[in-house]
Amino acid sequence: MREYKVVVLGSGGVGKSALTVQFVTGTFIEKYDPTIEDFYRKEIEVDSSPSVLEILDTAGTEQFASMRDLYIKNGQGFILVYSLVNQQSFQDIKPMRDQIIRVKRYEKVPVILVGNKVDLESEREVSSNEGRALAEEWGCPFMETSAKSKTMVDELFAEIVRQMNYAAQPDKDDPCCSACNIQ
């Protein structure tokens, strides 16, 4: 059974913990309690292949930003979360993706861009088109989720597994890496 390390990144209050807890336990956290660092494990079957996800739910506040390099160094897949009802959280996600590329020293890191809180449609500040355009620029999948209504939560974690599975395959067009798997 494959084990993967997934890191959930985003500003404070965007719903990183709520998404993670909803996926792992099937419950919604109503009260906001800022995270410093939480670690979860869950078995998941994606495309008939079992995997174990080790999910690191990170602090969104800037005072813990210095810890991000370590999280990123150890992560294999990244879920970048912003709140659809907070334009600033969308802007804040861009330097986080840049930090992933800088630490990993590789452009093709498995990343999913996630607009959370789709259940608050009437308060939306970030359009679907803005999210899609950024994901297209980055060459990664884009999803809109709701931890509260469980919209696309399971699909999100299944997709990051697919992205990590794909990244683990050697590049058939690159003769240097056709016989090895460098991570």
Curated annotation (Swiss-Prot):
Residues 181-183 form a propeptide. One of its GO terms (molecular function) is magnesium ion binding. Changing C180A: Loss of association with membranes. Its EC number is 3.6.5.2. GTP binds at residues 10-17, 57-61, 116-119. InterPro entries: P-loop_NTPase, Rap2, Small_GTP-bd, Small_GTPase, Small_GTPase_Ras-type. Keywords: Cell membrane, Cell projection, Endosome, Golgi apparatus, GTP-binding, Hydrolase, Lipoprotein, Lysosome, Membrane, Methylation, Nucleotide-binding, Palmitate, Prenylation, Ubl conjugation. It is a lipid-anchor. Changing C177G: Loss of association with the recycling endosome membranes and loss of TNIK activation. Belongs to the small GTPase superfamily. Ras family. Small GTP-binding protein which cycles between a GDP-bound inactive and a GTP-bound active form. In its active form interacts with and regulates several effectors including MAP4K4, MINK1 and TNIK. Part of a signaling complex composed of NEDD4, RAP2A and TNIK which regulates neuronal dendrite extension and arborization during development. More generally, it is part of several signaling cascades and may regulate cytoskeletal rearrangements, cell migration, cell adhesion and cell spreading. The effector domain mediates the interaction with RUNDC3A. This is Ras-related protein Rap-2a. It comes from Mus musculus.
